[in-house]
């Protein structure tokens, strides 16, 4: 499993010297390039949808941001702009899970036409119940090519219940065993679960920041991020027989 540690400051990427996740929200006002190795560009979906009730800008704005920062380091993927399906997010938008799933696909379709083909645009599967994720796989149809690296959204609130997260991932794998899954915002409890890790190709997390703040340390210290990433890497389980397939 590839782990991307989430960072508050893009400038910390060079210090951490590990695969990292940087939000587009941290780059909007930035002018200069930043040093980084492997990284993911986060779409800032939580801020937009959960707080503002939807995207304040059209997809062309995010596409321009992806193109602007793709030259920094080795950008593995720009995450597509999805619509989360947790109950509190649905309460904010007033829409249903099915509506959020349709909006997620529509946004992906729009971005595919705008993001340069040299940048991998990661599609995101949404839902809340396992069967809803399976339905979203079907709705994507041929958009999800064989072996595609695909995000599993709305799983971060299940971190305290790894079995629930694993059930979602298994439902997706049952529908499309070839997909290489990425978990957003995973916490230690979930990442420590072999049931979860064996289903994932990759994951990201900023749990280090919350933990540092809760324990009275600096929640913005890059050394906290580096230590957290080292801890995750140290939990690598025995190689799964499926890992070679997912790595192809």
Name the predicted role of every residue range.
Residues 26-28, 44-47, 153-157, 206-213:
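Short, acidic/turn-prone active-site loops that include or flank metal/cofactor-
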Residues 67-203:
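Eukaryote-skewed repeat-based solenoidal scaffolds used as protein-protein interaction platforms
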Residues 1-14, 79, 96, 113-114, ...:
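Alpha/beta catalytic cores of nucleotide-metabolism and tRNA/nucleoside-modifying enzymes
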Residues 5-6, 48, 57, 64, ...:
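Intrinsically disordered, low-complexity regions enriched in small/polar residues
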């Amino acid at each position: 499993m590839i782990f991307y540690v989430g960072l508050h400051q893009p400038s910390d990427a060079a210090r951490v010297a590990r695969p990292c996740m940087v939000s587009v929200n941290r780059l909007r006002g930035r002018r200069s390039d930043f040093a980084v190795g492997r990284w993911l560009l986060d779409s800032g979906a939580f801020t937009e949808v959960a707080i503002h009730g939807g995207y304040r800008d059209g997809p062309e704005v995010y596409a321009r941001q992806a193109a602007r920062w793709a030259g920094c380091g080795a950008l593995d993927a720009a995450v597509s702009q999805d619509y989360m399906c947790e109950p509190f997010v649905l309460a904010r938008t007033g829409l249903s899970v099915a509506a959020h799933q349709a909006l997620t696909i529509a946004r992906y379709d729009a971005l595919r036409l705008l993001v340069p083909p040299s940048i991998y645009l990661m599609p995101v599967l949404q839902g809340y119940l396992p069967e809803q994720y399976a339905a979203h796989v079907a709705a994507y149809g041929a958009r999800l090519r064989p072996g595609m690296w695909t995000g599993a959204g709305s799983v971060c609130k299940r971190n305290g219940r790894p079995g629930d997260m694993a059930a979602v991932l298994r439902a997706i794998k049952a529908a499309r065993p070839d997909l290489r899954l990425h978990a957003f915002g995973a916490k230690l409890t979930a990442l420590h679960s072999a049931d979860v890790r064996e289903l994932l190709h990759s994951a990201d997390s900023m749990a280090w920041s919350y933990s540092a703040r809760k324990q009275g340390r600096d929640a913005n210290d890059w050394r906290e991020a580096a230590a957290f990433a080292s801890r995750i890497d140290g939990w690598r389980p025995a190689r799964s027989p499926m890992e070679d397939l997912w790595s192809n």
